[in-house]
Structures are given as C-alpha cells and as structure tokens.
C-alpha cells in the first residue's frame, strides 16, 4: 500500500529539549524553575505505567498560577533536531505530515505552524487569564500511542497501512507495529531497531528511506 502520510513522534524525534527524554514536559517544568520537583515526579511515575494520567495531573498542579507567556518564552522556538528544517519541506511535497505525541500541544502547534505540517494530537495544560490553572488536557496516553494512532488516522481519513511513523523511544513500539512503514530515529533502545522496518541517526535520510522502503513493499505486493 502506498505511503500517504508521515507521522512523527515529537520529543526526541522532531525536537531535542534538555532532559533525559528530550521532553517538552521537562522543558516546561524546568523553564518554570521546578526542575527538582519535576525530576522527582518523573522518577516516581515513569515506572508506573498505569498511573500516567495521574503523573500529568501532578505536573499540571506544580505549574498552577505560573505565567504561560514567561514560560513559553523560554522554550519557544523549540530546539529542532538537526536536519528537521531542511527535511520537512522535502517530505511535504509528497506526503501529509503530522505529529502524534504525549508531549505538549503548545509545542506541537508551534511546530505545525512553523514548518507547515498538517495535523497533530498531543496533551496539554489548561490556561485561564494568562496563567496555568493546574489542570491537564489528557489526549495521548504515554504507553498506548497505538490506540491514539487509530483515532488520529480515523480523524484524518487515513488507513494506518498508508502511514509511515517515525519515533525514538520504547513507547513508540506499539505504533510502529500498527503502521505500513516504521522508522526508528536515533533509537534510544535496541528494541526499537527490532520493531522498525529501518532505522537511522540522520534525520536527513528519512525521505530516501521512505522512498526505498515503499518501492520494496510495492515489489513484494
């Protein structure tokens, strides 16, 4: 089946913030001056896969009352992965481009507008009168991104077999097993290499990888 869309993980794939997971969540917590508290929550909740929504709420509560503008000024524009700016326009000529992330919608929305990408699905934080309210917007569960991929494909009129997904971490593996073509980018664990059709450490190689893999699939069909 022909690849019609390329969907990217965001944190560690499109952008590389400071922190163990290059995460937009870490970026916003650190920018708010909450590094110690933020890291403590990460250490507690990351192993507890069934408590991800609780983790989001705990992070959101730490930000309650903090100015959104001041925090976003420190993390936008995002630190794009080398090669992103020159590669996305090339991909855009042939494919629809999207983001599926458990990261923050502030960042995903900025990237889509900045690079001309087409759609995204991401988590978020509630804002009122210019400050964080302490509430979260729960849209993408960290460990079940494959379910959210199906939701996103349905929303965008795509068959998952028409999708190339690009991700970097263990929570991306279920998505990789659900799409027509999976690329592990700068994989953080050997299991991603096993799950993906192909892998690379150079973002600029992605268009050629998609083209070559698509030809191989067409021949096998």
Model-derived features with residue positions:
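Active-site neighborhood of HAD-like aspartate-dependent phosphohydrolases
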Residues: 1-47
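Glycine-rich phosphate-binding "P-loop"
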Residues: 62-78, 133-140
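Short, acidic loop-to-helix structural element flanking the phosphoryl-transfer center
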Residues: 68-105
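Surface-exposed amphipathic alpha-helices with a cationic face
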Residues: 85-93, 145-146, 150-157, 177
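Substrate-recognition "cap/lid" segment bordering the active-site pocket of phosphatases
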Residues: 109-163, 170
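Short, acidic/turn-prone active-site loops that include or flank metal/cofactor-
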Residues: 122-127, 187-191, 204-206
């Amino acid at each position: 089946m022909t690849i019609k869309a390329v969907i990217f993980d965001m944190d560690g794939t499109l952008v590389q913030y400071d922190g163990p997971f290059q995460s937009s969540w870490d970026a916003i917590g650190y920018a708010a001056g909450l590094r110690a508290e933020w890291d403590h929550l990460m250490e507690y909740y990351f192993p507890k896969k069934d408590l991800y929504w609780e983790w989001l709420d705990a992070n959101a509560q730490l930000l309650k009352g903090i100015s959104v503008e001041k925090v976003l000024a420190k993390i936008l524009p995002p630190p794009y992965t080398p090669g992103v700016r020159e590669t996305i326009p090339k991909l855009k000529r042939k494919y629809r481009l999207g983001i599926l992330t458990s990261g923050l919608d502030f960042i995903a929305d900025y990237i889509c507008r900045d690079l001309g990408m087409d759609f995204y699905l991401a988590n978020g934080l509630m804002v009122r009168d210019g400050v964080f309210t302490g509430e979260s917007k729960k849209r993408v569960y960290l460990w079940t991104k494959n379910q959210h991929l199906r939701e996103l494909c349905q929303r965008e009129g795509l068959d998952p077999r028409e999708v190339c997904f690009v991700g970097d971490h263990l929570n991306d593996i279920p998505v990789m097993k659900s799409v027509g073509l999976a690329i592990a980018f700068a994989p953080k664990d050997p299991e991603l290499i096993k799950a993906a059709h192909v892998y690379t450490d150079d973002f600029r190689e992605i268009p050629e990888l998609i083209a070559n893999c698509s030809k191989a699939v067409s021949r096998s069909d």
